[in-house]
């Protein structure tokens, strides 16, 4: 006889990890219904897992959106979005000229081999986006805060142009995070994240998310999106709209076709780790944003720095976009143009001690990158010029270290070119807006392009 043992009192405050590749069904009828997508449930971990679902739900709420699909990386999330929107018709994409270099590689090389075409446009000049539209344009792609130059786009105007021309707006919200900006409230139809960065926050797990804000409805122009609105054997002779609903059809296709067939899925352990990171997102991002603004203001006075790329030094229009565009912070990424030769730039990088040289952002550790040699090294000369990056540009992604320690490290590294002419301590009592006003004497890249 087996003795009955009562369940112990108390429940875990952290959700358990469901580390299982497959799921058992009570009956064949249940399995048949789930696999035919006539009932909800899990079929195989490639398309769903309880931990992954929890992460998707959390990010959907943060973005104030409709639904989300988690992927193995941010690149995978972008790829699924573009395949689901432009792949079936060899569509055309209008993309920001100030994108992360890996996204440029994806657009101009790998996806170009599938028939996708792209035209780049300045995110600060909506007229360039209007001029780039063709009859095949299906997607506008841009970043809410650009990586690496941290400029803000004319998002609402650009989104209006896209929607007038039947295009879907995808916004990469990795740098801003939903804590600082929610693109769906400003015209975005889809939002993508490299969850590796700020959502995770500790430089460990690799993951991505594709989020549908609920603004895109393919039934408003069904002939433009037939792979979403017409029946197909893949969906049991139904359309994705019939299976998932108009506002979830796109991500239904992204998950059950492209994620299922290509396999860039997120593991249960990764989803669990990213969810733990999200629990401290607000605290981390607010500190990183404040520290980045302080460092940018300090470096704007340094004789070894020719220019600072940060929204508070981007000129009047950038300030207006920040104040009126729905931003709740400027993020933890900024860049500088070093006032020196290529050899001196390299010496500055190699002289940093606390700040590490690495190709990542959003870590609790402050990192530096040389975009021309690293993240943007495969750009063509034309793309490189349009990006605003130079061989003297250094990108910083600010962590959680003390601002005084970071300032000291930057000053000792920059001293190979010139010593600071004043102590940053004189500015510490000023709020960030006052520091920005005091430092506005240097020319901005945005004032001359």
Question: Which residues does each predicted region cover?
Answer:
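Conserved PLP-enzyme active-site core in the AAT-like
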Residues: 5, 67-301, 424, 429-431
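Short loop segments at secondary-structure junctions
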Residues: 22, 213-216, 338-341
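PLP-dependent enzyme catalytic core of the Aspartate aminotransferase-like
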Residues: 90, 108, 117, 135, ...
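Conserved small-domain helix->loop->beta segment predominantly found in fold-type I
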Residues: 262-271, 276, 280, 286-287, ...
């Amino acid at each position: 006889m087996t003795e009955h043992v009562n369940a112990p009192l108390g429940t875990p405050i952290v959700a358990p990890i469901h580390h299982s590749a497959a799921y058992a069904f009570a009956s064949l009828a249940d399995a048949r219904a789930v696999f035919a997508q006539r009932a909800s449930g899990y079929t195989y971990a490639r398309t769903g897992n309880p931990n992954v679902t929890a992460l998707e739900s959390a990010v959907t709420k943060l973005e104030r959106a409709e639904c989300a699909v988690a992927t193995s990386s941010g690149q995978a999330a972008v790829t699924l979005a573009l395949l689901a929107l432009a792949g079936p018709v060899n569509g055309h994409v209008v993309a920001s000229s100030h994108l992360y270099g890996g996204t440029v590689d994806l657009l101009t090389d790998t996806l170009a081999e599938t028939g996708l075409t792209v035209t780049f446009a300045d995110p600060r000049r909506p007229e360039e986006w209007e001029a780039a539209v063709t009859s095949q344009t299906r997607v506008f792609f841009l970043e809410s805060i650009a990586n690496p130059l941290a400029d803000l786009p004319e998002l609402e105007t650009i989104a209006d142009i896209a929607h007038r021309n039947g295009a879907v707006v995808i916004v990469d919200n990795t740098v801003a995070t939903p804590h600082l900006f929610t693109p769906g409230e400003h015209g975005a139809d889809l939002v993508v994240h490299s969850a590796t960065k700020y959502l995770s926050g500790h430089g460990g797990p690799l993951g991505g998310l594709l989020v549908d804000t609920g603004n895109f409805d393919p039934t408003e122009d069904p002939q433009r999106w037939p792979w979403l609105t017409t029946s197909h054997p893949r969906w049991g002779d139904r359309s994705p709209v019939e299976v998932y609903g108009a506002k979830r059809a796109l991500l239904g296709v992204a998950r059950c076709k492209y994620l299922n067939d290509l396999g860039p899925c997120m593991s249960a352990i990764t989803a669990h780790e990213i969810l733990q990171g999200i629990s401290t997102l607000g605290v981390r991002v607010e500190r990183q944003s404040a520290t980045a603004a302080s460092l940018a203001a300090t470096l704007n006075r340094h004789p070894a720095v020719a220019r600072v790329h940060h929204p508070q030094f981007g000129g009047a229009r950038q300030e207006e976009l920040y104040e009126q565009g729905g931003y709740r912070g400027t993020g933890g990424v900024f860049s500088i143009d070093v006032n020196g030769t290529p050899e001196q730039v390299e010496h500055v990088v190699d002289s940093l001690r606390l700040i590490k040289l690495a190709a990542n952002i959003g870590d609790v550790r402050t990192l530096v990158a040389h975009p021309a040699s690293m993240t943007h090294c495969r750009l063509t000369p034309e793309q490189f010029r349009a990006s605003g990056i130079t061989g003297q540009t250094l990108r910083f992604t600010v962590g959680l270290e003390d601002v005084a320690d970071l300032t000291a490290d930057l000053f000792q590294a920059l001293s190979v070119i010139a010593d600071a002419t004043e102590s940053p301590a004189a500015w510490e009592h000023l709020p960030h807006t006052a520091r920005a006003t005091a430092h506005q004497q240097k020319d901005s890249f945005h004032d001359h392009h």
